[in-house]
Amino acid sequence: MKQHDHALVSGEFAKHWAREPWPPGSTLYAIAQHDVAWQGPDASVRWNEEAGRPYSFLDYPSEPKLAAYTAGLDLLETEDSYAACLCSMHYETLVHGSQGEAERRFGETEVSRQRRIKTVLSEEEIGSLDRNLRFLKLCDGLSLFVCLNEPGQKGYPPPYPEGFVLDGQEFEPIWEDDRTLRLDPDPFSGPFGISLPYQTIGRDGRPLGDGRIELRVT
């Protein structure tokens, strides 16, 4: 599965969210586009010889991954400053505390980006960033749950092993059957569909086949 396709599914969860405060348009855009940086890396497969599979977002080599992150955030900043700041904060938290030099430099650069963007945001927008970052991460986690779990599996995906919480409320994903998922409690405006394309990749990086996961969220 391509990371950008996963992010678009995150955007579907966000778009159908029905609990106040309503996410503004720039937040919805940020959530749907938060992995636009992966379009370059996902265009060609890098094979992890040690693991015997393609690299995932968890073990992809740092230097090209961080370069892609930077390019993606640069693109977002030309389109929507608030969305770029939100995605920058998201990526910066992913490398926070890392001992790697490349990760440290990336984190410092993104903190500087955030400071720069905040100079053109309103006080209200700045005040909403932390909460909307938590909302982005919730929707990211819900999409990863769908991408990484077979129907019926209950494990929470990295980097959210402790579950899905927003504003003190925990949301539990429950499989009704192998094509239907619901959250308890239900935060959505109504049922909606999710369509997620995927490819099977051979060791030489060539696609062996493709398919599509079709789910109903109720």
Language model features by range: what are they?
Residues 17:
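Active-site nucleophile-adjacent alpha helix/oxyanion-hole segment immediately C-terminal to the catalytic cysteine
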